[in-house]
Amino acid sequence: YDWAPPAVEHQGRADIDGVHYILAAEESVRTGAIVSGQADIARQISAPQEGLLENKGVQIISHGTNSINNQLGFRFNHPFLQDKRVREAIIHGIDREEILRVLFSESYPLAQSSVAQTGLGFKDQSAAYTFDPEESKRLLDEAGWKPGPDGIRVKDGKRLVLRSNTALPQPRSKEVMTMVQDQLGALGIAIEINPGDQATQNADAKSIDKVQLYHIMVGRADYDVIASMYSV
């Protein structure tokens, strides 16, 4: 390669002879390769491993999606989620700061909107995502969901039980959903987490009866990427 575009500062032959990709599904293999010098770059390093690598002199570089943040998408055609008050109760019932503190690192900033800060059309909507469990309880009471004998809220004889997928490619999805399960359970909202493998997750996600809270992230950088949310 010896024909760089005129706008590029470096002209002439590339500084490196090539790039070799090694597919390593196990994180321990990836971290071991970079610590031992067998690799120069490793992707998909989990938050708990960052400190270990930094102590070994490895630089951690993180970046947002340029698109849709890691989030829970409401399938609001489901009868339990059609009421906006229930959706708002779920939002205010999740302590995002606690989740970040327990599971993640400084590489994962608190989201301010569905759209990432580096995404096209970003607008700070932090006020809509505040943690306020008392407001959650008020909204659920107002929507007619009253605590049942086991603590799970009930309306018209139906328990407020919602099912979530596990987004296996996304960082610590199962752990995140487990914390969400605990936080919302304290408010009387039962969350069932789909335990299936990737094939099962993909198949079940197509049915609103099997998945009502969809853990999702989109990496495309096009301006109308939020439209992706309307297809799940």
How would you describe each model-predicted region?
Residues 1-26, 49-68, 146-149, 154-156, ...:
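Aromatic-rich, solvent-exposed beta-strand/loop patch
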Residues 7-9, 82-182:
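Append "and occasionally in soluble cytosolic enzymes with long acidic Gly/Pro-rich linkers
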Residues 11-22, 158-164, 182-196:
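A local structural motif
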Residues 20-78, 85, 89, 97, ...:
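Extracellular/periplasmic solute-recognition and catalytic clefts
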Residues 34, 53, 140, 180-185:
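Hydrophobic alpha-helical packing residues
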Residues 38-41, 89-92, 180, 184, ...:
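Exposed, low-complexity coil/turn segments of extracytoplasmic
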Residues 44, 146-149, 185-200:
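Short, well-structured beta-strand/strand-turn elements
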Residues 113-114, 201-232:
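Acidic-aromatic pocket-rim loops
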